[in-house]
Amino acid sequence: MRRAIKKITQAVSPPQAAPVAASAGAAASAPTSTTSVAACSAVAAVSGTASAPASGGASERATNATVDEVATKVKKDVNKTIDDVKMTPFLRKITFFSSGGSFLDGYVLAIIGVALTQITPLFALDTMWSAAVGASVFLGIFFGTILGGWLTDLVGRRAMFIIDVVAIGVFSVLSVFAADPLQLVLARFAIGLFVGADYPIATSLIAEFTPKAHRSISMGAVSAAWYLGATAAAFVGFALVGIEDGWKWMLGSAVVPCIILLIGRHDIPESPLWLQSKGKFAEARAVMDRVFGEDIEIHEDEQPTKTSLGFLFKAGYFKRIIYLGILTLCQVVPMYAIYTFGPDIMSAFGLSEGRMSILGESAVSLFFLIGTIPAMFWLNSLGRRPLLIGSLFFMAVGLVILGIFPDAPIWVVIIAFGLYAFFSGGPGILQWLYPNELFPTHVRASAVGISISISRIGTIISTYGTPIFLENFGVGPTMLVAAGLVILGLVLSVMMAPETRGQSLQESSMLN
């Protein structure tokens, strides 16, 4: 197809056009120029229609007009890029299995909250050790996102895409054999390290393979997968909490999704945008031909560029990094605290301890999951910025109600939690979508990693401090602190949130 297009372009180019006969009689009797015939033949070959040679000045002008129209169409086709294609089953597969790392994150985080109901009395954990077990995974995520993002930009998306899932499965099995709190903390830290590495890997792959019209939906799948993993963990925990040594089955069960992910990820190729950014043009072209077809071109301005973290500290990009880090912190700190210590928080609101408190957490998990579904589409219809600001407002309202009325009836508690959880859908997607849209290919994974790592500083502190704060101040003040964080994110977003709807990755990553 590209060779046929080249022939058409050469045929209609002015320098090669044959001169028109000087006299009217010659023009009337002479056949159409060889060039025009060649152009029409090439056009016919591509379009599947036949064109007969024309004669005469009027026919010549008509032919030239037709060729000009075809040339314009051909030029448009030549410039067709990833953003112009439709979603295919293979692109959906990339989204599905790339989202699996997010599923694992939600699963391993939420399952520990349920497992702690058995681990705490078994290992005689005090508040400090319980907090350490909960926070250790976030410390691992903090280092994993930074290191994983840098390595992903340096050595590629695909290599890290496989390694991290294997490691998560191995350390999940090892955590089953923990004989004391320290071993459990170390195993959880290692799991967090590789879960954190998967954030920049998977979301970069999705962003670089997905057309812009579908990007918010594909990133929405990442966010939905997190909530789906957390919801699945809550129900698995609910089923196993009454079994002797159920905590071992809970922690070891993470190996099942790891195996499924390995099977699904084995044939997903390297990102063509990353390959081109490293000067590997032939490999990039081969991936494009395999995934999109020979007629689709890579973005023209993706030029070979050396990966450098210093690039992110340029004035404009540094501002974006700080904003995204704080925004994500304000969004995820309350959510992670709720998931990690969900049963304790539910008990504090009056849901009886044990299985009923776990069931209450499961209901809240469903609200989180349901909220991502309309948000996927609202991000395109309403835009990124309006949805973010509106969602943060309603999230704050839900937490303020919980903080002011901690002794409210259970139905009020569930509705307030539901309000907070449902509207977390938009910001939950944007924590993945914004970093991938606002930074260029050669530092995209690094930017995702750094912005996520900034937020994880807050999650480490909050996860360690939540049980201590709950014990000393109660659930009402705890919820008000969470509301304050969401309000901070709201104020910053009013001041700084960009609008990237409908833009290509090249357009959205440019500094204004």
Feature-to-residue mapping (PLM):
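Transmembrane-helix signature of 12-pass secondary carriers
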Residues: 1-22, 26-30, 34-36, 40, ...
